Amino acid sequence: MAHRAASDAELIAWVDEQDRPLGSLPRAELRERGLIGRGTFILLFNSAGELCVQRRTLSKAVYPGYWDLAAGGMVQAGEPYADSAARELEEELGIRDAVLREHGRFFFDEPGNRLWCAVFSAVSDAPLRLQAEEISEARFIRPELALEEARSLPYCPDSLQALRLYLDA
C-alpha cells in the first residue's frame, strides 16, 4: 500500500472540460472532488500486430482487477502528454525508447474518473518488465479479441474508448 499512498499524493495536472490547465492537485483529491485530470493511454503492439493487455492489481484505486488495453496513467503537473506516455510505458511495462505515435484525444467522464486522454501507440518485441504494484499479468492478443472479451470480462472502459479511437483513425 506504500505505492498507493505515494501515487495518491502525486501532483497531477488539473484541467477544465476543454483541457485548459487550471493548476495541479494531488491525485486522490482530484478523484475525490470529481475534478478533471489528464491521462495517457499507450497501446503497445508486438510486430505480429497483437495488443498487450494487462490485468490491473487489486490495490488500484480505479478499476482494480480489470483488464487494461493500454499502459499509461495520469499526467504530472507541467508534463507534456508525450513525456508522460514515454514515462508510463517504461514504468509499467519496462519498454523504453519506443517510437510513440499520437492518435488523438478524447474526454472521458465517469464518476471517480474524469480525464482528458491522449492516445498513443508503440510497437516493440522487447521483453516486458511488469510493474508489480500496478500490473499482475500481461498477454498479447488480437485487438478484435480484446473487444470481444470486453463483452464478458471486466475491461477498463477508458482504455476501451482509447482502442476504439485508435481503430477508427
Curated annotation (Swiss-Prot):
**Annotated organism of origin:** Pseudomonas aeruginosa (strain ATCC 15692 / DSM 22644 / CIP 104116 / JCM 14847 / LMG 12228 / 1C / PRS 101 / PAO1)
Q: What class of enzyme is it?
A: hydrolase
Can you provide one Gene Ontology molecular function annotated for this UniProt record? hydrolase activity, acting on acid anhydrides
User: Which positions are annotated as binding Mg(2+)?
Assistant: E88, E92
Instruction: State the EC number(s).
Output: 3.6.-.-
InterPro entries reported for this sequence: NUDIX_hydrolase-like_dom_sf, NUDIX_hydrolase_dom, NUDIX_hydrolase_YfcD_pred
Q: What is this protein called?
A: Uncharacterized Nudix hydrolase PA4841
Whether Transmembrane counts among this entry's keywords is no
Q: Which Pfam families match?
A: NUDIX
Which parts of the sequence form the motif Nudix box? 81-103
Cite the entry's keywords alphabetically: Hydrolase, Magnesium, Metal-binding
What are the names of the required cofactors? Mg(2+)
Cite the Nudix hydrolase domain residue spans from the record: 35-163
Gene3D superfamilies in the cross-refs = Nucleoside Triphosphate Pyrophosphohydrolase (3.90.79.10)
Record family assignment: Belongs to the Nudix hydrolase family.
